[in-house]
């Protein structure tokens, strides 16, 4: 966790996400890995441990941190009641679920996503504050999402427009057929008035997105395809300037990598290809991203992005395993990127 008395919720979420994920197998009494490197003035401590592959997190108005799970079947709330930086309470909210990865808190209610179903628990803070021994009532918000598990984890969040945003990854490394049969694949959608509307198309597998605090434009990460060598293609950071824009998959990757299987079809694709605003590196697997819009950090961090890089799994020399900072200018254009937290590979 970021050890500051005051911090922006979303950046806290990003950092807790990274650290909880890494330290799932550490107990509170174990020594903290001492090889993590952060900029001067920042400090990392363990906020929670002994969790089963936690992924997306969200925070309620009353300060409960809700945690989804990639491999487990439960949703938990974490609570640091004494404000010492460690969550002494872990409260079960739901169980018996299929990979309930995505969680989002909106207008008092908790939303969480399985592979093909999104649930809602109304007035979650009221239930948590009461300390009930009975699980809260959950109701189906929607239950007809694609059920494929390969790139099927659903990361969710509400946008500035009040709609729920849902990415649907492709059930493959590189393919075209699934999208031709079901256009929900390879895209990010918003759920508006009972239907899914495509916000970004040609997206292989996005598991992180956020909105610029000033422009309100949506920025999202995308995981690049595998098996084109150690150094190609790069994973991406994209911005949606126009709803429904096409970002290249499966025909083109990063800024200039033509796919060897589908690239020859580009002349037949009647769409404008949008390049990423930044290449994050090959096989780094970007996960959560978050804008920082508070005034506690040094000025350079404001209205720019932090991205958690899961790290490579099939590269000769490992890459990623960091949190990076992506600096944007006042108009939201990319300037540069730099490491913010490193050292996990040495642990």
Residue spans of the language-model regions?
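Beta-propeller domain segments
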Residues: 30-38, 153, 170-175, 183-186, ...
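A short beta-strand motif characteristic of beta-propeller blades
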Residues: 44-48, 89-94, 139-145, 195-200, ...
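Beta-rich, blade/repeat-based domains predominating
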Residues: 50-62, 95-113, 147-164, 201-216, ...
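Residue position within the beta-strands of beta-propeller blades
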Residues: 66-68, 112, 165-167, 219-222, ...
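Beta-propeller domains
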Residues: 66-86
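Short loop/turn segments immediately following the C-termini of beta-strands
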Residues: 69-70, 115-117, 123, 169-171, ...
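Short loop/turn segments immediately following beta-strands, especially the blade-tip
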Residues: 78-84, 121-132, 242-246, 325-332
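Asp-box/WD-like beta-propeller blade repeats and closely related beta-sheet repeat scaffolds
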Residues: 116-158
């Amino acid at each position: 966790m970021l050890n500051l008395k005051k911090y922006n919720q979303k950046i806290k979420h990003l950092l807790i996400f990274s650290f909880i994920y890494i330290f799932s197998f550490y107990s509170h009494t174990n020594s903290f890995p001492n090889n993590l490197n952060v900029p001067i003035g920042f400090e990392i401590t363990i906020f929670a441990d002994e969790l089963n592959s936690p992924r997306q997190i969200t925070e309620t108005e009353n300060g409960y941190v809700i945690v989804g799970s990639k491999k487990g079947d439960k949703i938990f709330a974490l609570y640091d009641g004494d404000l010492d930086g460690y969550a002494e309470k872990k409260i079960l909210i739901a169980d018996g679920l299929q990979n309930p990865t995505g969680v989002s808190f909106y207008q008092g209610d908790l939303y969480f996503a399985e592979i093909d179903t999104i649930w809602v628990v109304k007035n979650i803070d009221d239930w948590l504050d009461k300390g009930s021994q009975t699980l809260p009532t959950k109701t189906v918000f929607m239950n007809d999402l694609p059920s494929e598990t390969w790139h099927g984890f659903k990361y969710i969040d509400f946008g500035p427009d009040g709609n729920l945003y849902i990415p649907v990854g492709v059930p493959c490394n590189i393919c075209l057929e699934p999208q031709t049969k079901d256009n929900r694949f390879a895209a990010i959608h918003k759920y508006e008035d009972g239907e899914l509307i495509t916000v970004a198309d040609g997206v292989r597998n996005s598991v992180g997105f956020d909105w610029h605090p000033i422009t309100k434009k949506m920025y999202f990460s995308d995981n690049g395809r595998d098996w084109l060598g150690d150094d190609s293609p790069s994973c991406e950071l994209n911005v949606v300037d126009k709803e429904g824009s096409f970002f290249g998959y499966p025909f083109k990757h990063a800024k200039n990598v033509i796919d060897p299987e589908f690239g020859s079809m580009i002349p037949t694709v009647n769409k404008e290809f949008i390049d990423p605003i930044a290449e994050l590196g090959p096989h780094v697997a970007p996960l959560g991203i978050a804008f920082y819009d508070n005034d506690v950090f040094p000025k350079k961090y404001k209205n720019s992005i932090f991205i958690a890089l899961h790290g490579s799994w099939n590269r000769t020399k490992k890459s990623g395993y960091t949190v990076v900072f992506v600096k944007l200018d006042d108009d939201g254009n990319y300037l540069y990127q730099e490491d913010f937290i490193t050292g996990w590979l040495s642990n």
